[in-house]
Amino acid sequence: MLDPLDILTNIDDVLPYYQAIFSAEEQKVVGYEVLGRILADSEIQSLGPFFLDAGIPEEYKLEVDNRIIRQALDRFLEADSDLLIFMNQDANLLMLDHGESFLELLKEYEAKGIELHRFVLEITEHNFEGDIEQLYHMLAYYRTYGIKIAVDNIGKESSNLDRIALLSPDLLKIDLQALKVSQPSPSYEHVLYSISLLARKIGAALLYEDIEANFQLQYAWRNGGRYFQGYYLVSPSETFLERDVLKQRLKTEFHQFITHEKKKLETVYEHSEQFYKRVHQAVTSLRKNNLSSDDDFIKKLAEELTDCSFRIYMCDEEGDQLTGNVFKQDGEWIYQPEYAEKNWSWRPYFLENIMRMRNLRKGFFSDLYSDLETGEMIRTFSYPMDDQMYLFIDLPYSYLYEQDGLI
């Protein structure tokens, strides 16, 4: 890293770079993130390490940051009047004067022609060391001026979703650095799913950053990304781009994503239809045997479905379990009576799925999820026996893996 004193001595060589942010809706540049750079030893170097170094005095950082911002805003004065301006700020430094000096700087440029609603203030929640309530009040004050708030680096380090929800940002920036392989870990998928749910609840848009490959762009598109940023799209530059520079390319890639996703959904639907026919046939056949109890019924059904299931049970429409479990352990079916009378209505989508079965009168697969007891990625097939009784069949990962399109 460059010596901080060298940076201050050569502050005239500090300059802003701009990384374009693209819209999923219009496939065009909607704004730029302002990044700090310095010309040193005849090459452009990032100032990221300088700003992240806790040992560098605050006044040094503020001086360099102020120069970068002023140069950038002078450039935005000459650009399209609807471009969003994303600026990283250290929340700890902002709180030194409760954000007043930074706000005054933005107001100065408002007077020159940049409307305040174009500014997006990026902060990193997990780096903030002060009182989160005070930070919330400062950001709420900023928002009264129309300034947007983005919480940055989500997914890169430990982010506190409660604190993020309290800050109520306009955007959540999700870092895809952890997505370095084409098949992300289930736990990472779950974290991003939780973040997407939070975004929906608090009305925040998702911006995926650090996109460095096609599969990461596809992942961001599939997981609710409204905005995209990263080297796979464009590298940071000293100049602005034509706003439609990637429009045709993004249209082509999105079309490929849509085609792939439609095919995948059709495959799951076809598997669901075939599995429904198999279960329906088995249930109809077993009902003719007049078995003495529902527990005997699911034991017999387990034998019929032994190649594709590892747990079977029945519940009523309120989630009360009417049978025990039949559970496959070490390749053998065992009966678990202790599960009878447990209630599962608290589980996500349980009641929604009950109503869906009641109305459609058909069975269907759940999404892929992690089983609470085994930790294995599974799907559940839900089947309506009648208006009062519903059958649940858990399918193991080993079976799903063998079926095209169920993973």
From Swiss-Prot:
Coiled-coil regions, chain positions: none
Domain EAL: 1-250
Regions crossing the membrane: none
Cellular compartments per GO CC: plasma membrane
InterPro entries: Cyclic-di-GMP_PDE-like (IPR050706), EAL_dom (IPR001633), EAL_sf (IPR035919), Sensor-like_sf (IPR029151), YkuI_C (IPR018842)
One Gene Ontology term of the molecular function aspect: cyclic-guanylate-specific phosphodiesterase activity
Pfam families on file: EAL, YkuI_C
PROSITE patterns named among the record's database cross-references: EAL
PANTHER family according to UniProt: CYCLIC DI-GMP PHOSPHODIESTERASE PDEF, SIGNAL TRANSDUCTION PROTEIN CONTAINING A EAL DOMAIN
Descriptive protein name: Uncharacterized EAL-domain containing protein YkuI
Gene name, Swiss-Prot/TrEMBL: ykuI
